[in-house]
């Protein structure tokens, strides 16, 4: 606050209640944006400090018209005018936000830094691009008005957005993995039971209040195995190649990273946006091993006593494999970052044998029927 021009003595940042005044001021100008658990009177984490510093770049600076002290005999009178925003009449006006003729912190101290609204990221989410002079630092998605990671009813979106009127389906735009696709879930109205999204798919919802339109952005999670992990060279960064055969999903490809090893099972996202068409993110899939007791046609499996619903992109593969699993053997289920099943690794091989001899009455205590088997590896078993 001091760096933005706020005077601690004038604003009451002293005395027993200084923290209350500081917190109130910080919240009032948006320094806590992005932290729903802001306290203000406790030590901050590294991530929180970075967030507050970023928000300060966008904050408007302030100043005071006058601060005079008048002494008449034994009486001291302090006169202070009201606080006002610092004006900006330089060519940096508009580098941060609109041309509002107000001085944002970054406009004063980082004149080569600029933000550009109205862009979109690899998945077509409304985004802001930051540049240093002409060099692009990065494009970052704006905060969504609602977010889901499972299939959701349209009526629930209506309620979560706090809408008072419905939105026609013609005013809803749907992108899936960066590709514009047809929205077919009907008008966004109260109580609608039609659904969008999917289990294990990130669905970001953006509401344009001025235009009364919705943009839905679905980012699917796929699964693959690391087929090769290449070290960095003088001409290329380290990267991995994905194997998406077998029961894996998605288009696969390569991804620049040195975080994974050959045969790791990973989850990843992929963009089909023109100019992108590549893997956008990747993470090591969590795994759980145990006996699979049940499965459903929707692809959910119960392993080691816990039920895991299937990721929408993996449901069919998991169901088809689950029908062939030997229930007496352990399986390993791999999960996405939301806890949905992506892939099940199980021994589904079939052992063949020739019956050499069969006795209906073995002559033991229980008169058990027995057979002598010859397996393909030459071993025999009774």
Task: Name what the model sees in each region.
Residues 1-6, 22-28, 55:
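Glycine-rich, acidic and aromatic/proline-enriched surface loops and short helix-turn segments
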Residues 11-15, 24, 35-39, 46-50, ...:
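...the same signal can extend to comparable exposed beta-sheet modules
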